[in-house]
Amino acid sequence: MTKTRILNPTRFPSPKPLRGCGDANFMEQLLLHCATAIDSNDAALTHQILWVLNNIAPPDGDSTQRLTSAFLRALLSRAVSKTPTLSSTISFLPQADELHRFSVVELAAFVDLTPWHRFGFIAANAAILTAVEGYSTVHIVDLSLTHCMQIPTLIDAMASRLNKPPPLLKLTVVSSSDHFPPFINISYEELGSKLVNFATTRNITMEFTIVPSTYSDGFSSLLQQLRIYPSSFNEALVVNCHMMLRYIPEEPLTSSSSSLRTVFLKQLRSLNPRIVTLIEEDVDLTSENLVNRLKSAFNYFWIPFDTTDTFMSEQRRWYEAEISWKIENVVAKEGAERVERTETKRRWIERMREAEFGGVRVKEDAVADVKAMLEEHAVGWGMKKEDDDESLVLTWKGHSVVFATVWVPI
């Protein structure tokens, strides 16, 4: 790496883009070198690289610069946590934007900004509608990151598309003391009341149940609740997993035991659900090696930063603050605090098959609905069907972003 002369490595000047140094590959290499220096306790090299990064990656620059700035903040946070005295020697500590707490209306609009979540909503809802046709009771366990934002559209579809809407719709959600974005500014009790009232306007009777349960123990209390109160006659149990299972620890508890992630899926299979929908981001963030994890994250999180250039400034700030939170969690945290442990589509498919689930092909009408939705968004968004594993994949400029899969017990 070319040496950079630093007059005072402990004082960071205001960011100024350096000519010829703004390309993503250069920034990625600097970030990787910085991560290595931090974990090697090389304070001098850490200071040097942080200084360069600060100069080429202003937090209000282009998408690549903003992405790099987010990783810079994460590396600073990791460096300070490893060496607390370091904070007193660095005069510039860039602050991330505060995470916004959404109203229900704001969150619904926020989710609609990109297909990131809408893609999974549409694919999952279509599969659910097909699976529950003819059942008198539909019980949906919604393990979703988006606070039930998928459910109103599903209720609408049940009321309008099914030959005979179910006399009773039961919705179960988990409420935990553990939090990760997006945040909402109302309680789940209030949210449930709104959903029940909305279902009533569509002539559907709905029950809303909150189960205190946490990802950190594999949602054990939720599974216990479902075992205690099994499905009644002609009741379809649906488990909708939308970007939530990533938080269940994937590391084995002991050298001879399975991970909580594996245990959860096997216990879920024992409940014999009618259908399980699994929507996740297609990236591996589980490596114990920081450099490998950072490289994987950098080559994935450029996508959400690249998609926000057409957003209004406030929307972009909210959106990128959430991505920055993820980046900091992936880079700066370890152990139980590092909760962003997403796995690739391939690994999730292996897990589901090991738990004795079989994949179901997404119907053509769902594919058509996804295509119609994508036409409402920027031209970079696309979709591909993977015939070998029966999945749908959301893409940005040809790169895999989110996958949608549908599963039944075998």
Swiss-Prot record:
Tissue expression per record: Expressed in seedlings, leaves and flowers.
- Alphabetical keyword list: Nucleus, Transcription, Transcription regulation
Region of interest: SAW? 332-408
Chain segments carrying region Leucine repeat II (LRII): 190-227
What are the TM regions of this chain, as residue ranges?
none
Keyword Transcription regulation belongs to the record: yes
Q: Note the Pfam families from the entry.
A: GRAS (PF03514)
Its localization reads: Nucleus
Q: Which GO terms describe its cellular component?
A: nucleus
Annotated GO MF terms: DNA-binding transcription factor activity
Residue ranges for the region (Leucine repeat I (LRI)) are: 25-88
Q: List the disulfide bonds.
A: none
* Source taxon at top rank: Eukaryota
Stretches for region VHIID: 107-188
Where is region (PFYRE) located?
237-329
What does this gene product do?
Answer: Probable transcription factor involved in plant development.
Annotated family = Belongs to the GRAS family.
User: What name goes with this protein?
Assistant: Scarecrow-like protein 32
Question: Organism, per UniProt?
Answer: Arabidopsis thaliana (Mouse-ear cress)
- Gene from which the chain derives: SCL32
